Every structure is written in C-alpha cells, then in structure tokens.
Amino acid sequence: MRRAFTFAVLAALLLAGGAQSLTALEWGGTFDNTTTPPHYLGFQQEDTLALWLEAEFNPRMSLTVQGSYTYNLDRPYLFDVDILRFQGRFPLGDSSQMELSLGRFRVADFSKLLFDDNLDGAQLVWRSPRANLALNLGYLGLELQPVSTVSMTWGDLNNASIWAPPRLIEMLQVELPELFGRHSLSAALVAQQDLRSEDLQPEGPSAEVIGLGGRLSTEYLGVALRGPLAAALYYDLFGYLGTGRTLSYIDGAYSYEWVLSGLVGGGLRYFRGEWLSSSAELRLLLATGDEDYTDLFIEGNRDGLATVFSTISQPELALLFSPRLGNLMLAEASYSLKPAAVLQTLLKATFFLRPTLGPVSDARVDPASSSPYLGTEVDVAARLRLFSDLGLAFTAGVFLPGGAFRASDQETDFGGRAELSFSF
C-alpha cells in the first residue's frame, strides 16, 4: 500500500514536471480520536484521519500537503485540506535567511490569543541572529466553516455558508531575541477587514433587528517582553491596543462607531528539571469590557465609543467555561510534573471575573447582577506518550459558577475529555 501510494505521488509529480528535481519524499498519517463523556449535549465523539506529504525539490524548495477526513454525529462527512504549503528558503549571507511560503498554513500572533488559525495566502520571513521578521497576508473565506475558529459578528455566527467568514488578514511581527541580557522583545501589527457586502443591517433609523449585524473591521498594535528574572524563574508580559468600527444601535438608529479596547496579560513560571521536570506557573489576563453593551454581547454597543475587546479567532481558555475574550479577567495557577518519562501531569485552577458589570458572551450570566465574580474552574490532565507514535490524554474538570450567574444556572458543572493520537 505504501509503495503504491509513493508511486502514485511520484507519477503525479512527473506529470507536473517536477519529478526531475525531486530530492526527497516523505509521507505519513495520523489518526486522532476525541471523546467527551455525557455532558449538556450527551456523549460526543470525533475521529480524524489525516494524510501528509513532504516533498523536497532541492535544499531550498519544498512542498507540504495534508488532507483530512473528520467524522462525528453532527458532520459525518467532512473532508478538508489542512496544509498546502510551498516554501522557498533563500540564504542571505552566512547568518541570515529569507523564507517565502505560499498556500495554506497555520498562523498565530505571539500571544496565540488574538489569532491562531489557518490562512490562505503568503508569508515572508526574515531570520537573523539579531532580529526575526514575519509578514503574513491572506484570506480566511476559503476555509471550511465547521473547522474555522473565526467568529466576530452576528454574520459570522449565523453564516449559512459552508465557508468561513470572508475576512482579509494582515500581520506583521518583529522579534528581537535577547535584546538585552536574555530578554526578548516582540511587536505585532495586525489588521483584519470584513469583506462581507450583502445581507447586512443598513445604517439609519430602524427598529432593532436581532441577529443580522454589520461589518466589523479591526486593527491591533501589540508588544511583548519575556525573559528570566532569576535562576529557574521566567516571566512574560504582553499587551494589545485594539481599534476599529462596529455596528451600534443608538437612539433608534444604526451607525458605525469607533472601537478602542485593550488586552493585557502576563505570567511567572518556575521550572526545576531535577524535580521531575516540575513547573509552577501563575498567569493573569484582562480584556476590556463595556457596561453599555446589551446582554446579547455580539455587536452590543449602545452608547458611543465601544470598549469591548474582540479577538479574531476564539481561543479555548478552559475545558468547561470558555467565554469570548471580552469583558473578562482571569487568574490562572497551574502545576505540572513528569512522574515518569512517558507521563506528564497537570493541575490547573482558573478564576474568572469581569472588569465591568457589562455582559460577557455566556448567556448564563445575569445582566442585572452586580457581582463581578464569574466562577472558578479546576482541571486535571494526564498525557501519556507510550510510544513515539502513540499518545493518550485525559482531562477532567469542575466549574463552580459565581455570583454573576443566574440563580437557575449556578449548579456545579462537571466534564471530561479523552484523546488518542496515533501516527503512521
């Protein structure tokens, strides 16, 4: 089977005119299973089979392709192209290199909170001992909607198309490694444009229409600093300033109002390799909110300047309670260790609050509540790497809702997840 597949790939490359310069070819696959025990929606299971191919035409040119099939009860047939990346590497002197990538590939900002998803487009990277620069330009609307994590407006949420929201992304990131001592500085400029032109709520006087929404284009400027404070003690700090324009409903009329928002975070990490690779970490995160927003949260501005921070993709903050990163403050304490070479364990507690008494994206929060406390989640996880090509992971969590939740929704929440990964 493996020989037949390799022969078919070589034949395809020959027909394309590229086999004469092919110097290396590798292929393989992965099978991933995610199982969620009975919860709100009952027993859930998802299986993904992926096949990948890496072809090197010469030391400077390569092609990476990965396709996958995912099965679950909601979507029994989901075929996707995860990666389709043509990459060229061009040395610039003895210590620097330029890299150009075209196609579909994963892109993330330095925090992995603002944007972390696939991008169809181009990436230009310059690497040197003193500085690293990455410029990304791409389109999000060619990714399948079920696998996309991009969701910013009512139009994104109510998208009946199989395709992800039509948005254009530009991202420029600069890293200065070991700028002073062993401390590194990073900066990022990110912008996204909403290209949707139809089925939008027009500006002007109107009765309020729920669920239609408008366009949301945003820009972000971010900086980050990380490095050691002492032996085995490390820190990282970052912040984003966000702006843009969002559809707002004010005094019986729709209009686009300016956004001015912020996201700040940081952490301390203490690591001792000789103590079973023990790592203790404390992290803080704050995303601005707006008391003038309605309890629907999405495009909820009702009074002038909008100050809710909006991420482009939606990160997972915890196993059970993971609202949108807007009007949210959290403190996270975690401890991990490796009691065996094949076993990694983790204990994590996350405390959620809201910096303003405005709404958050979870509908269980009472808009009339004066409590800033959203709740506490405790998660435990174990990861087993039994063989180099076989891994298992088990996660369990409990969430205790806080005083900001409706009285009818303050029951303790339990949940778990089991994951299996096999490579071949």
Question: What spans do the regions from the language model cover?
Answer:
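Signature for the C-terminal beta-barrel architecture of outer-membrane proteins
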Residues: 26, 60, 92-99, 109, ...
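Bacterial N-terminal signal peptides
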Residues: 7-17
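Hydrophobic, well-ordered secondary-structure elements that form the walls
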Residues: 282, 335, 380-382, 393-394, ...
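Outer-membrane beta-barrel "beta-signal"
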Residues: 412-424
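C-terminal structural cap/anchor segments
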Residues: 279-281, 286-373, 377
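Positively charged n-region of N-terminal signal peptides that target proteins for export
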Residues: 1-4
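Transmembrane beta-strand segments of Gram-negative outer membrane beta-barrel proteins
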Residues: 20-47, 55, 59-65, 100, ...
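Membrane helical hairpin/interfacial module
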Residues: 64-87
